[in-house]
Swiss-Prot record:
GO terms for molecular function: uracil phosphoribosyltransferase activity. This is Bifunctional protein PyrR. The keyword Transferase applies. InterPro entries: PRibTrfase_dom (IPR000836), PRTase-like (IPR029057), PyrR (IPR023050), PyrR_bifunctional (IPR050137). A motif (PRPP-binding) lies at residues 109-121. Its EC number is 2.4.2.9. HAMAP family: PyrR. SUPFAM superfamilies: PRTase-like. It catalyses: UMP + diphosphate = 5-phospho-alpha-D-ribose 1-diphosphate + uracil. It holds the Pfam family Pribosyltran. It comes from Mycobacterium marinum (strain ATCC BAA-535 / M). Belongs to the purine/pyrimidine phosphoribosyltransferase family. PyrR subfamily.
Amino acid sequence: MGAANDAVDGRELMSAADVGRTISRIAHQIIEKTALDSPDSPRVVLLGIPTRGVILASRLAANIGEYSGIEVDHGALDITLYRDDLMSKPPRPLEETEIPAGGVDDALVILVDDVLYSGRSVRSALDALRDVGRPRSVQLAVLVDRGHRELPVRADYVGKNVPTARSESVHVQFSEHDGHDGVVISR
């Protein structure tokens, strides 16, 4: 995805304003689908997949709190040691897993990632989540779904569906990590 502040050449898919509107829309969808204000609603926990999934989870939690008045726990779930490509790709630094104080047992956990592609990161996240606790159910929220699934994975909340070629890359940029918001596609 590139290091912080790396310029990514390519075609802009989403501007900063588009990213903001899309995150707002996903937050509204989560509020509606989970019935957060219902007494029967399970506790909702957003767990971002590092790096940009953590930023997205934090922004979603802030938006949900602003729109519903309900504070949603959020954290980070490192999947590095659960990846199935550890031997074929350069080593990655371990990220910190941050589980909210209430844990994930019997909660509705929404895994959050920036881009859904093959589905392998989501599979790794499910494996990592199993070692953390036993949620009531698990859903998936992504900013961009670019297709080309290798595993039977489907997001419950999608900001934008973007058909891509396998030779293309989708780069999500957030100001907290990259200096600005946007989504770019490049070859």
